[in-house]
Amino acid sequence: MGVTTADVLVEARSALYDRRAQGLDGGMGFTYRNPDRSTDPLRAVAAARSVIVAARPYLTDIDPDVPLPDAGPHARVGRYAWVDQYAPLRVALRDVAKRIRRADHRAVAFADDNSIVDRAVAHRAGLGWYGKNANLLLPGAGSWFVLGSIITTAEYEPTPGPAPDGCGSCVRCIDACPTGAIVAPGVIDANRCISWILQKPGSIPDEYRVAIGDRIYGCDDCQDACPISVRLGRRNTIELDERADAWVDAIELLDAPDDWIDARYGHWYVTNREFRWVRRNALVVIGNVGDPADPRVRRVIEHYRAHIDPILAEHATWAADRLRERSHPGAAS
C-alpha cells in the first residue's frame, strides 16, 4: 500500500488528452471519457486530502492445464479476468474506508472504477514505476497486480514516490506485442492492442484477426515477456481459485444463451452487456485454432454464417475462410 496527496494528477491528465488527440485511445471511454474528472480526486470526494492506494496480486501459484486438442477449440483468457480479481480488493478497501469514517472523515473506496486513474495515483504514491508496456511495475514483484484506491478527507503522510525506473534498456515487452501496439516506451496505441480490440464493439479489423490467435478476452504477452514480472512475480502468487476460467470452450459459448454467458463471465467488461461481441471473438478463435475436420466446428460456423446479426455472420464467414486456408495452405481466403 501507499499514500499520496489528493492533488490533481497533472501528468496523467496531459497524457490522456494528448493520446486522445492523437487517436491512440481507440475510441475507448473509461478514464479517457472525462480526463478532468478522472485525474482529480476532489471530483470524486469533495475536500479530499489523501489517497490510499493498494495493489493485490493475481498471479496464481498453479496454472490451469491447457485443454487437450481433442477437447475442441478453446479460447484463452487474460490472467486478470480468470475470476473477478477486483472483488476481494474492493471488499478490503471498503473495510479500511469504513474504519476511516468512524473517525469522522469521509472515505470512499474505488476499484476498477473510472472515477480515478488508479495507476497514476499508485505511481505517485511510490508503489512502482511505469514499464515500457505502460503497466505499473512494483519493485521486486512486477506487474501482476490489480489496483484500487481510497479517497479520503483524512490527511496522512505521503509515502515516498515515484519509484525509480527499473526497466533500463530492456525492450522485451515492445518486441513481444503481437500487433506492435507499444508505439513508444509507455505509450499504447489502443487501436492495435488486442486487449482493447477484443472489448471494442464493431467488426474486428482484418489485419488483427490472425494475431488474436486463441484469445477471447485479454492479452498477457507484454507481461509474460517482462523479465521482472516473470522472475519476481512468483514471490507474490495467490492460490488458484476453483472458479478460475483460464480457458473457454468456444463451441459451448457459441451454443449458449446470453444469460448463461452472463452468469459465467459476467465479470468481463462487455459493452452494454451485448454478448454478440464475445461470440464474435469466439468465431475468430475457432477460425484460428479450430480443427477444420471437426464436425462440431463446421456445424457452428455454418450456423453463424446464416446468422441474422451481420457482424456475427461476417466473422463466421471469415472463420470459414481461415479454416480453409489452414487446411489447404496457399488457398485464397
For the regions a language model picked out, list residue spans one by one.
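Structural detector for internal amphipathic alpha-helices that build alpha-solenoid repeat scaffolds
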Residues: 279-292, 314-326
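Auxiliary alpha/beta "docking" domains used to position bulky ligands
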Residues: 1-166
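Short coil turns that connect the paired helices of HEAT/ARM alpha-solenoid repeats
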Residues: 199, 269-274, 303-312, 333
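Alpha-helical adaptor scaffolds
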Residues: 243-276, 283
